[in-house]
């Protein structure tokens, strides 16, 4: 065998070995991808907001509203703030719908105009929505965001002189009405 033929053979072996190594690496990578289990469940766990509301009500003596959610909805967060920095005790619960909608509920006790103005900053009253025996004020962002932010649309219910319920989020108006209806049912239970 001549030196030229041997050099060509060695050059072909290098290319062949490179291709074989690449194929083997891709095969191993594909096997790992297929073998490794993937968790496709929701990473955000459901929260027992009604249990947290019951504890908050027992410890505070306040009438905490924990509405029954429509089918497919669940709570991703709930908390009672008995001594917040702004001085307004409040109950918060976040709700997630079947199409990934989000509606937050803040129920505040002993509010003052400053607290309410802070909650409604960058919003303007655009109308009202009658829900059962209550009329909710609708506030929308003066400069809507794209994508929408959670407080670009809010419904506000003032009741008992200094108590307020706010619902806000990213959902269709009908979703807000459903949650407001569930809140109204709980508020009516309190007055019986």
Task: Show where each model-derived region lies.
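Functionally constrained cores in energy, signaling, and assembly domains
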Residues: 25, 31, 39, 104-108, ...
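Charge-rich, low-complexity N-terminal segments
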Residues: 1-77, 81
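Generic ordered-secondary-structure signal
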Residues: 1-5, 17, 33-37, 48, ...
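A short, solvent-exposed beta-edge/loop patch
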Residues: 33, 126-192
